[in-house]
Amino acid sequence: MNILEKETEMKTIGMVIAIDEELKAFLKKFDYVKNVKAGAYDAFECGVADKKVFAVKTGAGELCAAAATQFLITAFGAELVINAGVCGNLSKNLKILDTVVVKEVVHYQYDTSAVDNCAVGKYEQFESVNIPSDAIFREKLRSAFPFVKEARCASGDKFIAEKEDKEYLVRQFGAEICEMESAGIIITCKKNRVPCLIVKSVSDDCDDMDFMTYVEKAAAIVSDIVIKTMAML
């Protein structure tokens, strides 16, 4: 039986966190926090209920997020990887400070169409451009927080601030939110057969001014939901 098929309680969780505002929101709420130096990372060993959580701040971007995900799995034996933080809004059905759990991720900058005629975002190993997260953990979160909506996330190495980019992601992929780490995280988790839960709070309508105004509030909201969810796992 591989880790994706386990129904036992998760005891070791890895957390991939991109920026300081997100990390600070979480560190305030754990039962305990200890600094752990491992390799190139200044990690944090944290406690919530009977779970041991290892958190690292990656910095923005897919490559940094993928490297940190692999580090958490290899160094600490993470049985579940959680990415929690803030995102940009692409949907009329969402508003700033809403929280979503990511159902699918599309890596919108991955494009091999010139040589294989595949759709933009399509990796050979996945059936669709939409890479699914693990339903069992989404459902556990939403059973406790039914107001949290599911969303499709467009992920790439770009802060989306232009109207044209926003319209493209909606038109081409049906994306509802966007950010810069989830593709690297979910693909790394799939490679390792480790489940992944991605939870985001909307900090902006793809506008840098909204982001600076709401990032701390959004991070506080998502951290509350994720901490309580981890305690239930």
Question: What does each of the following model-derived ranges do?
Answer:
Residues 1-9:
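Short, Lys/Arg-enriched N-terminal segments with co-localized hydrophobic residues
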Residues 89-173:
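Mid-sequence, gly/pro-rich, charge-dense loop/helix-turn segments that line enzyme active sites
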Residues 71-75, 93-94, 186-195:
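Alpha-helix C-terminal capping segments
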